[in-house]
Amino acid sequence: MGKKIKKQTVLPLNVKPKGLTKKVQLPKDQNLTIKELTKYDILFKQGEKNVSKTSDFVEVGEDEVDSEEDDYFKNSSFLKSNLTDDAKFQKLSYSKQLENEYEDPKEKSKAEESVKQLKKRKSIDDDEEEEYNELEEDEIYNEKSDDDDDDDDDDDDIENERENDENKREWKLETVVKKRLPIKTHDGRMKTITQVITAKELKETKEKNEKTKEQLIEQVTKERNAKNKQKGKKPTATPTTISKEVNKQIKDAPQKKQKKKDNDESSDESDTEIENLDVLDRDIDDNEFNDNSKSLNSNKDDDFSKLSEGERYLKEQELIENAKMSLAKASSLIISNPENNIQAIKELFSICINNKNIVIKKYSILSLCAVFKDIIPGYKINKDLADEIKNGQTSADGAGQPKQKLSKEIKKIREYEKKLLKFYQNYLVLIENSISNILSLLARKVPNTNGIGFFKINGTNYSNNDLTSLLQCILKAVSTLLITHPHFNFRTNLVTITSRFTVYKDKDIAMMCLEAVKSLFEHDSTGGETSLEVVRCLANVAKSANYLIDPKVVRVFLAMRLTDVIEKINPFGFASDEAKLGKKDRKHLTRTEKKKRKEDKSLDKEMKEAEAEFSVKEQKFLQTEILKAIFILYFRIIKKAPNSPALTSVLEGLAKFSHLISVDFLGDLLKVLGDLIENGITSIANAFNTNITAFKTIKLHGGSLNVDLKDYYVRVYSLLTDMVLPKEHGVIVTALDALQLMLGDKKQTAVERVASFIKRLSTIALFLPPHASLALVSFIKQLFITYPQTQRLLETDSTFSGGDYVPEAQDPDHCNPFASTLWELSLLTNHWHPKFEPILKRILSYNESQMSSQHVTRERSPLELYRSYDNSKGGFNPPIELPKEHHLLGKMRKLKKSFKNREIQVFITPQKQFEKSSFLNQCQQQTSDKEIQKQNITFDNYFNENKDFNNQMKLFKKLENLKNLKSRLDSQKSQKSQPQKKNTKKILNTK
Amino acid sequence: MRPMTEEESKTFFEKLIKFIGKNVTLLIQRKDEPYCFRIQKNKVYYVSEELMKRSQNIPREGLCSLGTCFGRFTKTGKFKLNITCLDYLAQYAKYKVWVKPSSEMSWMYGNNLLKAGLGRITEDTPANQGVVLFSMNDVPIGFGVTSKSTHECRKLDPQALVVYHYGDVGEYLRDEDIM
């Protein structure tokens, strides 16, 4: 492959990063000083004007990075592997070489040589390497940020390129999507994408749906008219500009041809491509004019203007519905039998491109994505086949190349694969173009009319909202494809797009991409290759954003699944010992042996591809590389941007992966962390994470020497009080982990220090939510067991100590904890939470003899306590218990049973000097409260009811008697009966 | 008994700072009680002000000792720390070295500490730094000066010197008569 093609392939990427980096930096402007801002502005302007002059591949920032790095890590291990040291260059890990490839122009040629050598040696397959190369390459192009508008400059570029990298010509770039790929139709003629699509579309519309076509035309004409009115009737403007461009490109073509003589391989192909390009532009013109003329002929303009807004809306809806229907038809057709009906994808493409309605575009993009998701096979399409496609028809016709005889079925499958790959390629090209167009439109710039996207730039004016939603749609498609088929061809493009948009200013889009990356890390079916690419890409993105990135982006790495096969990492050292050993072995080989070896290797490689499984060795290599890339990013952030918001997640990541850092790196790591601890750390979470890293590594690699990390204790101790702030409450899990590492080991720390930590932790526990303070209390209990001497804190008398307790001291060694007592614990015994009391009682009743017999393992760990009693979501955990039953109540129930539910009378003599017990209260309530009595049919109620009934009956009889008496005496003694009557009434009322 | 002259206090605090760094201020500005340094017969005493005021009633010749002795000035004007100040040094020590039980006795007989006896050391201790030595149970047993930094200590062979002897608790027995 020649560089011209490469140039073309890379072009679509060129514009994006510039806009992107700018955008990325903009929201973070607050963090930058004005000086820096102006510097950036100047840089950008320079970049836009003079890019082409900076033709070599050196990126200034890149050089700076490494020189600084040298200064920074001046400790032993890094010096050993000096990057610029020629002699040791080859010993460096493979990826490191690749990474540094372009950092130094002098080194470059050497690097390439060594890459070539390595290529021969390394057992990884070529594709992977090339993808790495491309990755690097893309980045460089991006950084160069050249401007495509200047065609003259382009030529200079091309020349420079040729001078600069003769070697690169060998690199095959089949995995990068080529633009404007020619499509071969059944009659063998070459057609460009749009040609095919339009032809198909016309046929389809004629055959299928006359109505939709009319509507389409109406729509188009309407928009076109509107546009023309706006532009003041300049319909010829577009064709002229386009023709200009065409002319330019035609001009370019012969120049390119001249250079092409150097490399014969690619000449034909790039020729055809350029022609295609021209044809393509013309095609667009033709289409539009066809549309125009048709609509003019039909004279429907007048009708259209008459339409009311509502009708227009309805028409639009109808249009969308129709489009939906046809999309669904085509998609289901493809999915029902992809091998036969793959041509139907063209329909989807045509719907997408030829509709102006943004909703239809979105639908079609997504349905295309869904279709591809379903029909993409579970394997990577063979390299040869991909080559074949790239080389166009010449090789397919078998011009001079003897072809293997294939059976019919295989031929069919191959044919299908070829088509699929082609369509997929086209899809990706469209995606890339439209992303770049959208970005430039959003930045209110005139997009370079470099490629056709999903929409025509000169068409209708889309609003910002529309563009963003379309962008979101496209990225959704990209990320879905990346997640579901990371093994498939062209994943590099997907990876680049996805990782670039993780730092996009629009939060929704960024989150979507992050989610995609995360799930990719979690279920990487390629055994880590894709993850590695993503990690590297993200590192580049972070660099271009000056490491001022969202902590969420860096936190994504935590989702990485790393197995045990991984080896310990020294991020700036050798990849492994294998490389060194292998080199020695190889020296003994003769030429013939070498040849044989080569053959064996290529055979092995094919076999491996067929296996489609990842050997342990491969996995080990990949994961080591991934981890190394992550660590390099981490340390760059710590070193270059310690004020970056991402520092939190960096420290989290270090804490998580700290067990994988190799012993050689111990000194450097401790130095970096020490600097951080001294002045970089301001939040308690960061302090804890740093401590976890430091203590873990020390514990793993400290070896014979037992060091006391005093500074780390001091920092955590002084920041510990921050934990009471509500925003820091979530840190408790990390805190427990860190504290366990710091203090949990037996006899690692001075008793005094432990005691001051205990004192401060118990003070904090008073202010925390119950589950957190419960965890702390239980941790304190563990400390009491590990350090029995600290139990002096629990004694109130005869405690010797010089001076007073200094609660506000910064240093745990100076606060004199034994002058105080743990009054906090006795205060916590009154906590409403039911679980405090048992734990605290156990602590407070400790003494030496009990301690030895105590089984610590039996009890729940602080973390378990924290988790099980978590009530951060509200409510009570554990739930509130019902009050306990009074013991007399149980007795009564027993009695009742033994008497077989006969009536019993219970006599209670309440004692006045005590408060009423709950039992008595209940009994009294039962006897007094009639409402409740009626509902509850119990023994008591029955008894009371009976009694009442009898009373009432008695009273009733009395009343009757009295009434009789009254009637008798009424006439004689009216005064006598009245008081009696009153009496009876009273009695009744009281009852 | 008199306060120190400027020259005296300079040499004295320089020596003290070598062991406890900035924490010297904590010695003087105590929360509970004001303390001060006084010289009596070439010896420097750390004494609470109340005690100091009371002792002013005793004539200089008759006053044998007061407060805690921190050390003495030699005839040449140098200051030498005494082991009696160990409690305060231990409390405020910036860098600490823990001694393995096997080497404790050797240290307390006045020998230098070897790498073999090094139980634990504070991270980032520089060379030629005053350190306080502890037994593994955190009992202070003396003080000395490091010969190597922590980082260098990692690669040292067991017979190499790590801490030069300066003072140890064995002096309480050995030099009982001159204390």
From Swiss-Prot, chain B:
<dbReference type="InterPro" id="IPR036974">
    <property type="entry name" value="PUA_sf"/>
</dbReference>
<comment type="similarity">
    <text>Belongs to the NIP7 family.</text>
</comment>
<dbReference type="GO" id="GO:0005730">
    <property type="term" value="C:nucleolus"/>
</dbReference>
<dbReference type="GO" id="GO:0042273">
    <property type="term" value="P:ribosomal large subunit biogenesis"/>
</dbReference>
<dbReference type="GO" id="GO:0003723">
    <property type="term" value="F:RNA binding"/>
</dbReference>
<dbReference type="InterPro" id="IPR002478">
    <property type="entry name" value="PUA"/>
</dbReference>
<dbReference type="Pfam" id="PF03657">
    <property type="entry name" value="UPF0113"/>
</dbReference>
<comment type="function">
    <text>Required for proper 27S pre-rRNA processing and 60S ribosome subunit assembly.</text>
</comment>
<keyword id="KW-0694">RNA-binding</keyword>
<protein>
    <recommendedName>
        <fullName>60S ribosome subunit biogenesis protein NIP7 homolog</fullName>
    </recommendedName>
</protein>
<dbReference type="GO" id="GO:0030687">
    <property type="term" value="C:preribosome, large subunit precursor"/>
</dbReference>
<dbReference type="InterPro" id="IPR005155">
    <property type="entry name" value="UPF0113_PUA"/>
</dbReference>
<dbReference type="InterPro" id="IPR016686">
    <property type="entry name" value="Ribosomal_synth_fac_NIP7"/>
</dbReference>
<dbReference type="InterPro" id="IPR040598">
    <property type="entry name" value="NIP7_N"/>
</dbReference>
<dbReference type="GO" id="GO:0042255">
    <property type="term" value="P:ribosome assembly"/>
</dbReference>
<dbReference type="InterPro" id="IPR055359">
    <property type="entry name" value="Nip7_N_euk"/>
</dbReference>
<keyword id="KW-0690">Ribosome biogenesis</keyword>
<feature type="domain" description="PUA">
    <location>
        <begin position="94"/>
        <end position="170"/>
    </location>
</feature>
<dbReference type="InterPro" id="IPR015947">
    <property type="entry name" value="PUA-like_sf"/>
</dbReference>
<keyword id="KW-0539">Nucleus</keyword>
<comment type="subunit">
    <text>Monomer. Interacts with pre-ribosome complex. May bind to RNA.</text>
</comment>
<dbReference type="Pfam" id="PF17833">
    <property type="entry name" value="pre-PUA_NIP7"/>
</dbReference>
